[in-house]
Amino acid sequence: MTRREIWDTVYGAAAAAYEPREARAVAALVCEDRLGLRFTDVIVEPDAPCPLRDDLQRLAFEIGSYRPAQYIAGFCRFCGRKFSLEEGVLIPRPETEELVRTIVERHRSDSGLRILDIGTGSGCIAVTLAAELPDARVTAVDISDTALRIARRNAERLRQTVRFERRDILTGPPEGEFDLIVSNPPYVTESEKRQ
């Protein structure tokens, strides 16, 4: 298949499920990560052959079934870094990046800051704070083994030191004192609370 044919297939599936701007972003994310095909490559050499690294029809089906692109790609971008993701770990929201940027701006000159991230998920908050505030000691907790596995993987891949701990925060905080506690837990609707 050519680059253009692959792009058209992926974009067509995304366009059936998303608004045009979002469809392009979804197609670009999935093509680049899962197929190794950047949109600029499609523009520059649309007729160049492109070997497939994935089953294109299955990929198109996943996109068309409204599965989030970040789960299809297996990653998300957060504060300029690439974080592994999989189902069972929530996709960080743009406002979470704003929260992290605000913390970094306010505490950039603080030395030895002790930070606790509650409900770390993918580890994006904890790992980014460890990277941006290198003198900080960051602890991250989550109740989910899946989340902790992904968060540890992200910290290792991005070469950041974060202490991860499995903990239900409702049963008590981790040992130690903290200068800053940060959390951006998932939103729970009233109907979900009743379940």
Stretches with model-predicted labels:
Residues 95-194:
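Conserved SAM/SAH cofactor-binding pocket of Class I
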